[in-house]
Swiss-Prot record:
HAMAP family: ATP_synth_a_bact. The keyword Transcription does not apply. The gene is atpB. The lineage of its organism: Bacteria, Pseudomonadati, Pseudomonadota, Gammaproteobacteria, Alteromonadales. It is a multi-pass membrane protein. This is ATP synthase subunit a. GO terms for molecular function: proton-transporting ATP synthase activity, rotational mechanism. Key component of the proton channel; it plays a direct role in the translocation of protons across the membrane. Pfam families: ATP-synt_A. GO terms for biological process: proton motive force-driven plasma membrane ATP synthesis.
Length: 264
């Protein structure tokens, strides 16, 4: 594959594909491509599942209906096995997280030059198509989960119960309150950070490998042939990675919210 636009050095090619289409500066920088693809894929998910739901029949289902029902049953069984409280929000939330994250991850399957080349032809200099390789996207989702953890912890346990959980565990003695508070606060904050960084790190590394393989197509015939083999092998392996990362994000969300519902 060739770099879009004018000829780039290997370093420039990599940097070009890892640069977001942005507006603004500093803290107020907006990554337009990440927002476009994440919101667009979210809307596609809602439209697709709503359409299947409206057309669902009790007779012989079509292939798409079977596929959607299989996903829903898989997520529902995962929630029932992991979540020990009662909350009608958890299963729809888990379904949304799993499918949405998978769809964003799946954009990594698109050859690295296709969409950036179309964007360059339209006069758009940068176009990064995998939203989950953007820390802003992964952290925004993780922070959303974090806020739900705080909300349900206070709702189920009350403010006093939540404060007690932070100050009287794991050592149930007033003299250990500072130590308990430090340990529990670090544990609480580590949850969204680990969610965000795990998803970002795996997908960013996967995208970088695809870019490095794409560089081989611009070399000699031997490297180009090797690139085809490597790309096919990595493509097959990466399907497992993107699915696993969506599943892990969903399962950790369920586990964290289940812990928030446990009244000690």
């Amino acid at each position: 594959m060739a770099a879009t636009g004018e000829a780039l050095t290997p370093q420039g090619y990599i940097q070009h594909h890892l640069t977001n289409l942005s507006v603004g500066e500093g803290f107020w920088t907006w990554h337009i491509d990440s927002l476009l693809f994440s919101v667009g894929l979210g809307v596609l998910f809602l439209w697709l599942f709503r359409s299947v739901g409206k057309k669902a029949t009790t007779g012989v289902p079509g292939k798409l209906q079977c596929f959607v029902e299989m996903i829903i049953e898989f997520v529902d069984s995962s929630v029932k096995e992991t979540f020990h409280g009662r909350n009608p929000v958890i299963a729809p939330l888990a379904l949304t997280i799993f499918v949405w994250v998978f769809m964003m991850n799946f954009m990594d399957m698109v050859p690295v030059d296709w969409i950036p080349s179309l964007a360059a032809a339209a006069g758009i200099p940068y176009m990064k198509v995998v939203p989950t390789t953007d820390l802003n996207i992964t952290f925004s989702m993780a922070i959303g989960v974090f806020l739900l953890i705080i909300y349900y912890s206070i709702k189920v346990k009350g403010i006093s119960g939540f404060v007690k959980e932070l100050t009287m565990q794991p050592f149930n003695h007033w003299a250990m309150i500072p130590v308990n508070f430090l340990l529990e606060t670090v544990t609480l904050i580590a949850k969204p950070i680990s969610l965000a960084l795990r998803l970002f790190g795996n997908l960013y590394a996967g995208e970088l490998i695809f870019i490095l393989i794409a560089l081989m197509y611009g070399a000699n015939m031997a490297l180009s042939a090797l690139g085809v083999t490597l790309q096919l092998g990595w493509l097959i392996f990466h399907i497992l990675v993107i699915t696993l990362q969506a599943f892990i994000f969903m399962m950790l969300t369920i586990v964290y919210l289940s812990m928030a519902h446990e009244d000690h």
